[in-house]
């Protein structure tokens, strides 16, 4: 069903009404100066940060490296690094903020993905209540099953979780690293290590 502006406005109104109730339960006055527009702002922010639940997944635009696929049988790796992402932890609805690195092995047909499309896939699966371990798996599956038909996909996530930063243990330094492997990356440790070396070398020359 096609989404309309009327649908969006109704969602904002319904969510804002419940945010007002939450503010009251917390002991706040949602009518005081400074909070009058907060429920609507929060509603719009939540809808934006969970937009992936209500929109279709982005399609990967395919480009060809050439007509002779034989040139790509040596497992050429494409690495898209430092894709900034933010999501909402599904346990506490607090932000997860970090970076995603995506590597894939070009198929023998020489098909590669449009650069921005990989970023859109990261944004799409980040825009929902999420856990980081699932996020990297979903990104890996989306690319592995796309029209570029890569021989393998490797997705690395590195992020700070506000649920442990501002509450609970309140650790300001801890980061979570999660990795998903598909195809050749799943069984070939040399290929895995090659990607880690690429990231490490980029860091050494101040490219990270």
Curated annotation (Swiss-Prot):
Catalytic activity, EC: 3.5.4.16
One GO MF term: GTP binding
Pathway annotation: Cofactor biosynthesis; 7,8-dihydroneopterin triphosphate biosynthesis; 7,8-dihydroneopterin triphosphate from GTP: step 1/1
GO cellular component: cytoplasm
Keywords (A to Z) from UniProt: GTP-binding, Hydrolase, Metal-binding, Nucleotide-binding, One-carbon metabolism, Zinc
Superkingdom as given in the UniProt entry: Archaea
Amino-acid positions noted as binding Zn(2+) in the UniProt annotation, renumbered to this chain: 89, 92, 163
Family, similarity comment: Belongs to the GTP cyclohydrolase I family.
Subunit structure: Homomer.
HAMAP family named in the record: FolE (MF_00223)
The protein's name: GTP cyclohydrolase 1
Organism: Saccharolobus islandicus (strain Y.N.15.51 / Yellowstone #2)
Gene that specifies this protein: folE
